[in-house]
Regions:
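The Walker A (P-loop) glycine that initiates the GxxxxGKT/S ATP-binding motif of P-loop NTPases
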Residues: 16, 78, 100
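Walker B catalytic acidic pair
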Residues: 93, 99-101, 111
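Basic, amphipathic alpha-helical bundle interface domains used for macromolecular binding and assembly
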Residues: 83, 106-295
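Conserved alpha-helical scaffold flanking the Walker A/P-loop in AAA+ ATPase domains
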Residues: 3, 57-96, 128-129
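Conserved inter-motif catalytic segment of the P-loop NTP-binding fold
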Residues: 40-72, 79-80, 227-237, 257, ...
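Walker A/P-loop
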Residues: 12-56, 118
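Pre-Walker A (Motif I) flank of P-loop NTPase domains
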Residues: 8-13, 92-94
Length: 295
C-alpha cells in the first residue's frame, strides 16, 4: 500500500493497535517519493520563506509535516489576524502525516475536505480573503478503538460497542471518502531472531515510483490522485464488461460516487506500476480491497 500511495500520491490511512509500526511506515513514505521538480521546489521555498523557515539543505526533498493532535484550527489550516499559512500549506507538494487521527478536533478535520479536493485553502477575514496552496498527500494513522486493542487475540480490549462507535464517529464519512487507501496493520508475533522475508528494497521501490510518476506526468501532467473529473474520464477508461463489473461491485458495497472515482485512480496507479496502458479487472479488484471494511 505504501508503494501504491507513493506512486500515485494517494491519501492513506493506517489502522491498527499500538506498536504495529503505523508511524514507522508513514515515516518511510518520503524516502519513496521522487524529488521536487524545480518549479515545485520554488513554490515550497516561497511558502517556507513566509514562515522564516527555509531549510536549504532539504531543497529538493518533499515536505513532511507531522502536527500534534492538539493542534488548533489556525495552526493546521492557517489563519490569524494577518493570515499565515498552516501545516497543510507547509505540506504543499509533500506529505501531511496526522497520527492518532480521531484525536484531532472534528471541526478542524472537516476543514481538510476542501483542500483535499481543490489543492488550496481560502481563509476569509472581515476585509479580505486569502488563498494559500495546499496540494498535499494525506497520510494518517489511528487505533481501531479508544484503548487500541480491538480484535487482538489476547482479549485486552475493554471498550464497549458504544465506545467503539463513538470513537469511529469522530471521523465523518465524507472525510473517509477522500482517503484512497485504507490499510489495517496487524500485529506480528514477536521473535528474538526473526526470519527476514525476501522483498523489494527501498532503492528499487523508489525507482518504480519514479517511473510510475513519470508515466503520469507525460500522460496527464499530474499524479493520478490529482486527476479531475474530465481527466478521470479520459485516462481511466474501462472496457464495457469491466465497467459493468465495477458498477455492480460499487452497488453491493454501497460505495459513494467519490469512492468509486478514487478507486479508479488507485487502479490507474496499479496499472502504471505494471507499466501497462489499460486498467484491467485485477487492478480494479485490488483497488477494491483498499476500501474501508465498513463499506
Amino acid at each position: 500500500a505504501l508503494l501504491i500511495a507513493a506512486a500515485g500520491a494517494h491519501n492513506l490511512l493506517f489502522s491498527g493497535p499500538p506498536g504495529t509500526g503505523k508511524t514507522l511506515l508513514a515515516s518511510r513514505l518520503p524516502g519513496l517519493l521522487p524529488p521536487l521538480a524545480e518549479c515545485e521546489a520554488l513554490e515550497v521555498a516561497a511558502i517556507q520563506s513566509v514562515t522564516s523557515c527555509v531549510p536549504l539543505s532539504h531543497w529538493p526533498q518533499r515536505p513532511f509535516r507531522q502536527p500534534h493532535h492538539s493542534a488548533s484550527g489556525p495552526a493546521l489550516v492557517g489563519g490569524g489576524s494577518k493570515p499565515q499559512p498552516g501545516e497543510i500549506t507547509l505540506a504543499h507538494h509533500g506529505v501531511l502525516f496526522l497520527d492518532e487521527l480521531p484525536e484531532f478536533d472534528r471541526k478542524v478535520l472537516e476543514v481538510l475536505r476542501e483542500p483535499l479536493e481543490s489543492g488550496h485553502i481560502v481563509i476569509s477575514r472581515a476585509k479580505d480573503r486569502v488563498r494559500f496552496p495546499a496540494r498535499f498527500q494525506l497520510v494518517a494513522a489511528m487505533n481501531p478503538c479508544p484503548c487500541g486493542y480491538l480484535g487482538e487475540p489476547t482479549g485486552r480490549c475493554s471498550c464497549t460497542p458504544d465506545m467503539v462507535q463513538r470513537y469511529r464517529n469522530k471521523l465523518s464519512g465524507p472525510l473517509l471518502d477522500r482517503i484512497d487507501l485504507h490499510l489495517t496493520v496487524a500485529r506480528e508475533a514477536t521473535a528474538l531472531n526473526p526470519t527476514v522475508k525476501p522483498g523489494e528494497d527501498s532503492a528499487s521501490a523508489a525507482e518504480r515510483v519514479a517511473e510510475a510518476r513519470e508515466r503520469q506526468q507525460k500522460r496527464q501532467g499530474c499524479a493520478n490522485a490529482f486527476l479531475d473529473l474530465p481527466g478521470l474520464r479520459r485516462h481511466c477508461t474501462l472496457s464495457t464488461v469491466d465497467e459493468t463489473w465495477l458498477e455492480t461491485a460499487c452497488e453491493r458495497l454501497t460505495l459513494s460516487l467519490r469512492s468509486a472515482h478514487r478507486l479508479l485512480k488507485v487502479a490507474r496507479t496499479l496499472a502504471d506500476l505494471e507499466q501497462v496502458d489499460g486498467i484491467r479487472r485485477e487492478h480494479l479488484a485490488e483497488a477494491l480491497q483498499y476500501r474501508p471494511a465498513t463499506q
